[in-house]
Regions:
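Glycine-biased, small-residue-rich flexible motifs in mid-sequence functional cores and linkers
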Residues: 2-175
Length: 175
């Protein structure tokens, strides 16, 4: 049986696809939010606390918002005024989901797709996360599995720009 290998370059879109306020891409303080799939309930609460704190700041949050935790964080963020960049691991939707239309219309949400794929899968999620890291100024990790794909991905990111919420006592999350 032959194993199919897909190069990251082959799934990257020739041109970034966007819906919403493209000026958000130029924001000077873009914090990425990523998390390993495995996360303790206590660390989930830290992520919610962080999202509540950051949602009314001038920072910009960039993430894939794909996992259930990340989707919850997006809901917290959209209740505030923080600009948000949602990065898809697939090509853009034909129709913007109902719950995202208002923030897009208000100019607070930019939806982008750096990949050319009809569906999200492991390789496109990896390409998406690489794009997020290349376009942020700092990184907040909800949790980090030292043996997971995310740990390998963030290994080259400057350590002094990473905050891992699982390592911080509850209530003391940095913005």
């Amino acid at each position: 049986m032959q194993k199919l290998l897909i190069s990251v370059n082959s799934i990257m879109a020739a041109k970034l696809q966007m819906i919403g306020n493209a000026a958000i891409l130029e924001h000077p303080d873009k914090v990425a939010f990523l998390s390993s799939r495995r996360i303790s309930p206590a660390d989930v609460l830290k992520c919610y606390e962080w999202a509540e704190k950051v949602r009314d700041t001038e920072r910009c949050v960039i993430s894939g918002f794909q996992s259930p935790l990340e989707k919850d964080v997006l809901k917290f963020l959209l209740r505030g005024k923080v600009p948000v960049i949602l990065v898809l691991a697939r090509s853009l939707w034909k129709t913007v989901p109902e719950e995202l239309r208002e923030p897009v219309g208000q100019g607070r949400l930019l939806i982008v797709s750096p990949v050319a794929a009809a569906r999200a899968y492991s390789a496109t999620a990896s390409a998406r996360n690489r794009w997020i890291l290349a376009n942020c100024t700092s990184l907040v990790l909800g949790s980090l599995d030292p043996n997971g794909n995310l740990a390998r991905l963030v290994a080259s990111f400057p350590r002094n720009h990473i905050t891992c919420l699982q390592d911080i006592p509850s209530g003391q999350e940095n913005l």
